[in-house]
């Protein structure tokens, strides 16, 4: 669906996949999920299906941190732009600043004026909807501008799994994910899963004792563990079978055609 959307966007005839108006997004307060830190068990831990890059399960040490209860919105991204976010070199990683200047990046992909492109064509941009189609470079710059940071993949997964007796777990099937009856569109609402894939600051690297699976599945994951970043959480175009705490999506830092977004983190 994301490939189809990109193809429609590049078509000068204004072709649509659906002819519907976007529903208004849910507005949620920005609270924080706090985690006390300590030893967390990460990776696929059940007998169900998982790709080889989701394991082996292992332990990591976390310092105390907090994860935002909702995704960054279009309205907040407008504030970033208005404050000179795309013109302030100090906010950007060196490679990211070079990418911005070389490609004249001024806004997320599929934005123009106060509209954004969807599977149903150009529509008014909802300020309360999660911002999507941004690169890792943009996500990192926004986090710097906001005075926070991106989470690590381990922090994100620890919040998703919860902590017995202290922190509730989050339902991987509970968010806005693929529905055959409606076009994929981020709506917000505060769920950890769904709406858009969320960038982490973790490089896409093998877990301790990782061994590629035999056959075609092993060809897909291990060979791409170079120069990419991990994303968590599933999107509005993700089948629910791919939504789980251990799932590791991965993209190069300049790529934007997927439903990618931002959830902020901070140290506590």
Residues covered by each model-derived region:
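Acyl/amide activation-and-transfer machinery of modular secondary-metabolite enzymes
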Residues: 57-63
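Functional-site microenvironments in short loops/helix caps that host divalent-cation chemistry
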Residues: 3, 7-51, 55, 70, ...
């Amino acid at each position: 669906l994301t490939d189809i959307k990109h193809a429609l966007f590049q078509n000068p005839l204004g072709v649509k996949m659906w002819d519907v108006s976007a529903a208004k997004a849910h507005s949620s307060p920005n609270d924080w999920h706090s985690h006390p830190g300590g030893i967390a068990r990460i990776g696929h831990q059940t007998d169900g299906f998982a790709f080889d890059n989701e394991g082996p399960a292992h332990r990591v040490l976390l310092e105390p941190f907090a994860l935002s209860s909702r995704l960054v919105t279009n309205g907040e991204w407008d504030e970033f732009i208005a404050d000179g976010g795309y013109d302030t070199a100090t906010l950007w990683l060196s490679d990211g600043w070079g990418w911005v200047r070389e490609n004249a990046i001024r806004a997320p992909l599929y934005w123009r004026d106060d509209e954004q492109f969807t599977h149903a064509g150009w529509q008014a941009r909802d300020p309360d909807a999660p911002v999507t189609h941004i690169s890792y470079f943009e996500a990192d710059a926004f986090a710097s501008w906001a005075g926070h940071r991106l989470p690590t993949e381990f922090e994100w997964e620890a919040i998703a799994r919860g902590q017995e007796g202290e922190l509730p777990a989050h339902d991987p099937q509970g968010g806005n994910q693929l529905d055959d009856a409606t076009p994929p569109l981020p709506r917000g609402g505060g769920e950890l899963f769904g709406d858009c894939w969320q960038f982490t600051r973790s490089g896409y690297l093998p877990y301790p004792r990782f061994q590629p699976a035999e056959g075609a599945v092993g060809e897909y994951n291990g060979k791409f563990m170079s120069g990419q970043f991990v994303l968590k959480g599933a999107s509005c175009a993700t089948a629910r079978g791919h939504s789980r705490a251990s799932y590791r999506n991965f993209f190069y830092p300049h790529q934007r055609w997927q439903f990618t977004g931002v959830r902020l983190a901070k140290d506590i």
